[in-house]
């Protein structure tokens, strides 16, 4: 980041912010340390600051002037053994032994992100449906509805 002449966008699998589910906490253990380093970089280099961090687990929030944005998985949401449900044929279940612990999407989820020099991040929305019952129809915790859904939310964020 020290050598770039441009704004910085990070991509990671695990989030650089944190959120708690009924089973576990998602995010890196040292997320606070990383956030502090990024915010310090922004303080020292406002002309080439970190504007966003994209990941695949949590949601969108602005922390210290940096957008931490999750993009829902392309294929499914992991539910775990407590929510086992066979959604496909016995053959598919046999060949993909973990699939019964997921809530798969009918179609792949993907999006486009436009980052503009006018200080905006535009995320195109995309919707699909669950294959079979939703996680919540299987008893998945209702308080996780803001994070577990078969769509990517359309957003316009300012940085």
Predicted region positions:
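Acidic carboxylate-rich catalytic motifs and surrounding loops in phosphoryl-/glycosyl-chemistry enzymes
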Residues: 51-58, 126-128
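Intrinsically disordered, low-complexity regions enriched in small/polar residues
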Residues: 8, 21, 28-36, 40, ...
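Binuclear metal-dependent phosphoesterase catalytic core
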Residues: 61-159
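Active-site metal-binding loops of divalent metal-dependent hydrolases
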Residues: 14, 56-58, 73-74
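Active-site-proximal segments of metal-dependent phosphoesterases and phosphodiesterases across multiple
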Residues: 2-54, 63-64
């Amino acid at each position: 980041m020290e050598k770039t002449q441009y704004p910085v966008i990070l991509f990671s699998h695990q989030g650089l912010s944190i959120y708690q589910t009924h089973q576990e906490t998602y995010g890196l253990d040292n997320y606070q340390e990383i956030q502090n380093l990024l915010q310090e970089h922004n303080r020292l280099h406002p002309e080439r600051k970190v504007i966003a961090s994209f990941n695949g687990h949590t949601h969108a929030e602005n922390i210290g002037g940096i957008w931490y944005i999750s993009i829902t998985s392309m294929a499914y949401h992991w539910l775990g053994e407590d929510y086992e449900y066979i959604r496909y044929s016995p053959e598919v279940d046999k060949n993909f032994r973990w699939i019964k612990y997921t809530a798969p999407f009918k179609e792949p989820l993907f999006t486009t992100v436009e980052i503009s020099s006018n200080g905006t991040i535009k995320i195109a929305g995309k919707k699909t449906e669950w294959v079979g019952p939703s996680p919540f129809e299987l008893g998945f915790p209702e308080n996780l509805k803001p994070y577990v859904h078969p769509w990517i939310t359309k957003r316009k964020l300012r940085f």
